[in-house]
Swiss-Prot record:
It holds the Pfam family Amidohydro_1. This is Dihydroorotase. Pathway: Pyrimidine metabolism; UMP biosynthesis via de novo pathway; (S)-dihydroorotate from bicarbonate: step 3/3. The active site is at D275. The gene is pyrC. Zn(2+) 1 binds at H60, H62, K138, D275. Its EC number is 3.5.2.3.
Length: 417
């Protein structure tokens, strides 16, 4: 091919294998994967021992802003995203005020256009209201942060014109069991699965945390249903509550048996997402539920690769390829013609997680002091370096995702590529 705008040279992951070569970038898109060194106007040579991966997609992020800008802003949260190797975030709509009408949705988009350092998808909350056109829809089956939930899940689910991300905790059981034991999640998952099977509508179940909940999803095996797990449910358990009262989260941290079952079935889990939910330390001490995670999720997973718990392909499948396919994102993925979103990881870098080095306003992390091996050292968004060696580069240049159309039909296997 003729000369391109930018060539990134080094080892990169391609079809489950790490190969030597180069990636040609033209007009913000991946123009060519090559086994040889392509010619370009500019060149980035990735040092030996480091690997080029696709920019990652986090389908579950709470960026606060609006009346909770003291907790997080779109600017601070998307800086945290690109610092952690996340190039596209899905913005959860249970904000203050909540995104439940077209006017608020448009205001949200205006702020993103001006302030976002990463690309983004806009969510819309349904709880008895009529949906406006968004990139995805969110339904809470029980109260969480913000307190708004659906009183009639089937009716609200039926209204949604595109894929629904559901917080599966049954509201009637929450009232009876405020500590939210596994049954609260399992009953809600069963209810959501039954509705999806009946309506044949796409559904994404957020933060599956229990052995029995995951069993229900796998047993149902509904082609248009996807789901996610979070790093905190993979790496923490109820025993961690003993070391910190700040770890309150919905759904709660579970028993070791649940955590182990998630790991044992990781190949069947299509998506890993952070559920980044920042609060100030004061709010956490007062009982707010939610954990920050944008700047630790990839680090924890790279460390797991080094420990032989997962493969680097698992990360790419569950945080790039599958999210782009399941949510029908036309311009994202690890293919020629898609946006040139790349990250460079140093698999040998040993470091200690410290909240003081993060961009999120949360100012704390559940993993403070953890020693990990593997780090994101560069983030490229649509052909531009936006983060290198922990420093954010340039001004906000985030753009809204481009959808292929409504996310529907067979979502395919969890490891499709």
């Amino acid at each position: 091919m003729t000369q391109v705008d930018l060539v990134v040279v080094g080892k990169f992951l391609f079809k489950e294998k790490i190969i030597d070569g180069s990636i040609g970038i033209e007009d913000d898109k991946i123009a060519k994967f090559s086994l040889r060194e392509l010619k370009g106007d500019k060149k980035i040579k990735v040092e030996k021992g480091k690997i080029i991966l696709p920019g990652l997609i986090d389908v579950h992020v709470h960026l606060r802003d609006f009346n909770e800008s003291y907790k997080e802003t779109i600017a601070s949260g998307t800086k945290a995203a690109i610092h952690g190797g996340i190039t596209t975030v899905f913005d959860m709509p249970n904000t203050k005020p909540p995104i439940m009408d077209e006017k608020t949705l448009k205001l949200r988009e205006l702020i993103f256009k001006k302030k976002s350092y990463s690309d983004y998808a806009l969510g819309f909350l349904i709880a008895g209201n009529e949906p406006a056109k968004a990139d995805f829809y969110k339904i809470f089956m029980g109260a969480s942060t913000g307190g708004i939930y659906s009183k009639n899940f089937e009716e609200d689910y039926k209204k949604a014109p595109d894929i629904v991300s559901v917080h599966a905790e049954e509201y009637e059981l929450i009232n009876r069991y405020p500590e939210r034991p596994p049954i609260v999640e399992v009953v809600a998952i069963k209810k959501a699965l039954q509705a999806s099977k009946k309506m044949k509508k796409p559904l994404h179940i957020c933060h599956v945390s229990t052995k029995d909940g995951l069993k229900e999803i796998l047993k149902a095996n509904i082609p248009w249903v996807s789901f996610e797990v979070t790093p905190h449910h993979l790496f923490l358990t109820r025993r961690d509550y003993e070391r910190s009262k700040l770890l309150k989260v919905y759904p709660p941290l579970r028993d070791e048996e649940d955590r182990r079952y998630l790991w044992e079935n990781l190949k069947s889990i299509p998506i890993i997402a952070s559920d980044h939910a920042p609060h100030t330390l004061e709010d956490k001490e007062a009982g707010a539920a939610g954990l920050p995670g944008l700047e630790t999720e990839v680090a924890l997973l790279l460390d797991a690769v080094n420990k032989g718990m997962i493969t680097i392909w698992d990360i790419v499948a569950k945080m790039s390829i599958n999210p782009a396919r399941i949510f029908k994102i036309k311009n994202k993925g690890w293919e020629e013609g898609k946006d040139a979103d790349l990250i460079v990881v140093d698999m040998k870098k040993e470091w200690t997680i410290k909240a003081e080095n993060f961009y999120t306003k949360a100012n704390w992390t559940p993993y403070e002091g953890w020693k990990v091996k593997g780090k994101v050292i560069m983030t490229i968004l649509r052909g531009e370096v936006v983060m290198e060696d922990d420093e954010i580069i340039g001004k906000p240049r985030g753009e809204r995702i481009v959808k292929e159309g409504n996310a529907q039909g067979n979502l395919g296997s969890s490891q499709e590529h």
